Amino acid sequence: MELYERIIPKTSSTSYISGWEALNIPDENRNTADWHPRTYLFSYDKDKAINLYNTTNVLGNSGIKKRTIDYPSKREVYIANFPRAIADLVLTMKDYQLPSLHNCCSDFLNEDETEQLYQYLRSIKDNPRVDEFLKYEFTVRYFNDKKL
């Protein structure tokens, strides 16, 4: 079977590449956070498109930027940075999928990006999934912040 590059639909600041797809596209420094581009950027279905995200109602436009990507092919798109991509996953994935993000900070992010992710998610109130993620991924900080 032939493998095809997934179609990248028209993006905007409110409909952008994020999640696993963004984690597999190199950032401005040519780094990738994840290492499964074939899974998320290619398909045996020649008409399959990349999923676009929109959580701007919760997180605004922080971490979303218009830039040129070189992979899977060169084009200008709106794309989330790695911390925002993980925050979008936490907000949009099904509860049973959340464990796939366990240890994502040490697996995917540097120290500054880890702090960005924490700040994104800490700003979200009354969301049990976000609380559960913060409890697991940022245990000490989560409980220290609860004391304040």
What are these regions (language model features)?
Residues M1-K66:
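Short gly/ser-rich loop at a beta-strand->alpha-helix junction or flexible surface loop bordering the NTP-binding
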Residues I64-L148:
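Hydrophobic alpha-helical interaction segments
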